[in-house]
């Protein structure tokens, strides 16, 4: 689960990190009032969406008057912001962050992720702040400094100082950076984060370090014990189908093809998408109904898949292990009847009660195409969707 910048900065402040004074606003009137409360003669206004590249898309602006703030808020509130990280529809803007201006002498980068290879939290720092860290990693990987956090002892002050020295910091900046490093590590662990970035972490003309941006991603599997953070969830930033799928504990990711996929198991789902692609088709989604699929979840999965108008055929690929194929077959029949499926449905069943499941489908009287193998299923569904 991702957080908005203003929410991330609220957490930063709670953990002692230096952030700008800012107010998240819902209306142009609130945005103008926020400028009065913050004070000064210049501000930064930022559209709040779960995507990078806002500045290049016009979603971040330095303003010198309250009239400019009002115009910016009127331009973006209730509209969609399209950046290089969004799809062509963009993401809706429901809040504008109004912040005090911060003068910048230098931009740095500081972030942390869970490294699956080392099974540890890894901090990354770089002198190349203000640009995409992925670009830095690709073009000049030697400019990215790393520090692994030992899970037994946690982040240590010496690691912060070591990174600070390598970044070329000096004097009071060493202590400031170490404090930010330790605060960020504590936040990462206590709030079950999956990713956190400060880009840029700036040095002001006075020589102080300041967190100018906040990108925070929370481990969705830990939200049950992060009630406060869970309340920050903004479903408007997610694909509506993905949000609906999450309610039913379905793993759904929208894609851009025309062949809907319903599979049990993430690995089998990825393999199914691969073979559709190899057969000349384009998957419309990734959908894993899981090992504990029920008739109700299968029915909801169909509804979600068919809510995508681009879908011209559906492939159901089930390997019966924990879940019985005959139960899945009953769910498919119920869903086809309830939803009124108008597109071709190709079903491949293998494993637990596969023969019984195939028999149930055959006796249903519905227009469901039974496949004899995964390769056959892919060929059938591509053909049904109008492919080769």
Curated annotation (Swiss-Prot):
Its cofactor is Mg(2+). Binds 1 Mg(2+) ion per subunit. GO terms for cellular component: cytosol; succinate-CoA ligase complex. GO terms for molecular function: ATP binding; magnesium ion binding; succinate-CoA ligase (ADP-forming) activity; succinate-CoA ligase (GDP-forming) activity. It catalyses: succinate + ATP + CoA = succinyl-CoA + ADP + phosphate; GTP + succinate + CoA = succinyl-CoA + GDP + phosphate. It comes from the Bacteria. Its EC number is 6.2.1.5. Mg(2+) binds at residues 199, 213. NCBIfam families: PRK00696.1, sucCoAbeta. This is Succinate--CoA ligase [ADP-forming] subunit beta.
